[in-house]
């Protein structure tokens, strides 16, 4: 999955911890997109296991943002500008469980002009990064 970080929220002073990953493969290859996949913990706000993504551009509201691994698919049903979230904590728990077992996950999304992008994330090291983020923010 990549890495784990803990930071302080400048507004509340509360701790924010997250596991994050950069794509190992992107389609299309052209362009420099700052795509990421996150699982975040914000104890001050009573938020844990928050799954989010950014594809490095503002999303097209007419198309779905989907994470898929094997036969499992998960819809990011909240999108604001260049970030997307899953509104159901139950679904977030399912995707995290899948991320702990799988080796790869793909996020498919569409930019404002309707062009599709696919970001492939390795899940090697996800469980370690997730456990560390969770431990540091509880």
Region annotations inferred by a language model:
Residues 3-4, 8-138:
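A generic "folded-domain core" signal
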């Amino acid at each position: 999955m990549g890495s784990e970080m803990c930071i302080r929220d400048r507004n509340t002073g509360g701790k924010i911890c997250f596991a994050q990953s950069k794509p190992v493969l992107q389609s299309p290859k052209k362009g420099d997109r700052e795509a990421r996949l996150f699982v975040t913990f914000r104890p001050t706000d009573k938020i844990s296991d928050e799954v989010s993504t950014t594809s490095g551009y503002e999303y097209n509201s007419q198309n779905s943002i989907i994470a898929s691994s094997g036969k499992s698919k998960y819809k990011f049903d909240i999108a604001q500008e260049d970030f997307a979230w899953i509104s159901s904590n139950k679904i977030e728990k399912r995707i995290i469980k899948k991320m702990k077992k799988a080796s790869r996950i793909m996020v498919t999304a569409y930019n404002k002009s309707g062009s599709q992008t696919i970001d492939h994330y390795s899940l090697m090291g996800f469980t370690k990064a997730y456990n560390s983020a969770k431990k540091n923010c509880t």
